[in-house]
Amino acid sequence: MTFSIEKLVDLKRKKWQSKLQNTKKQVLGRCLTNFSRLLSFRKKQETNGKSPRCSKATLAVVVHPTASTTHDDFLRKKQERSGKSPSCSETTLAVELPDVLVEEILQRLPVKYLVRLKSISKGWKSLIESDHLAEKHLRLLEKKYGLKEIKITVERSTSKSICIKFFSRRSGMNAINSDSDDLLRVPGSCNGLVCVYELDSVYIYLLNPMTGVTRTLTPPRGTKLSVGFGIDVVTGTYKVMVLYGFDRVGTVVFDLDTNKWRQRYKTAGPMPLSCIPTPERNPVFVNGSLFWLLASDFSEILVMDLHTEKFRTLSQPNDMDDVDVSSGYIYMWSLEDRLCVSNVRQGLHSYVWVLVQDELSEKWERTRFNLLGHVFPPLSLNSAWFSQTLVSPYQLSSSTCIGSRQRQNSTSALFSRNGDTGAMDAPIELHISVSTPMMPL
């Protein structure tokens, strides 16, 4: 008898949990529909040349919990102004939602809409720029769609701005390599943040093309041999690592959590003098580590763990002993967070060596691969993969987006997407100012 009662209680609990989930989905669906109507209304006003305006009743669909204006206050003020009772259509949308539902709605919106919604109020701006929402937004994209990467290339626009061009995977390799800038380097892109530096300048820039935010870093003295960018997968801290040469080869790391440069040898010992990365290739960030091809030969690969900040070396695939890295035919890249090495001299139908890692060992596996434009990364040093995400955890130094120039069939302010695949039909250009002038050519 006792077992039957417990079973009945358990069934009732599951039934109510199911009803709660269905109710939550229905509320979210209605709110997202109202959001879509609101954004369509704003877009229509912008198209007609009008300044987009939204009533407080409309925005109350997802009013922030800290807002002081209640629904009753709104009705009272409206009655005082017009002497009329608010219509049913105006009061239908005036619904306050709890914090959880507000975040559930916002994290499902595209990045470009969230950027526009920051201008509604200080409360909205604070919520959208919070690390918590940015992290949830990123994880939801990864879970639902995977990080749909596109190709970007960075070029000098003026002495105080750079131009970021966005390309679809279907654009192929030639579109990326056609206008290569010999002095700009893009050592990496991680979670929607892009690292850029110049060979003839001391500055390093961190950009978020989706929000227009930039951060300028000035590393210690010395000639930059290579710059790497990635995230510590243990702590979630973004780090910029610089190999430099002055009177000897050294390494400095910038931690974006502490906002300080530190000499790496203080914690991990000096870097081997023979481990000089080749300037013809950018480092590759894979699963919390940076990988470099060495300039001396291709017998080893230099590896730095961004958590421990210690260096080690990795042996090359055995089948590639006869290939000279200085020839420029060896390319190292990341695919599905795995390190890949390929010989581009073999053409599009090439063998690719994939590094398979686990807790106890790591080994190379060779596979035949079709290196088409939608899979193979850009070859030029000023290009990289890029994921369109909200992540911009360091808003302390902001800059102004100068503008965007559209090409070909693009129809939106920044992006033109294929409705079926979600892919970009680009190329599209975005000009972002930097807080320090870029050195003229």
From Swiss-Prot:
Show the SUPFAM superfamilies listed in the entry.
F-box domain (SSF81383), Tricorn protease N-terminal domain (SSF69304)
Show where the F-box domain sits.
91-137
Q: Name one Pfam family in it.
A: F-box
Quote the InterPro entries the UniProt record gives.
Answer: F-box-assoc_interact_dom, F-box-like_dom_sf, F-box_dom, SCF_F-box_component
| Name the record gives this protein | Putative F-box protein At1g33530
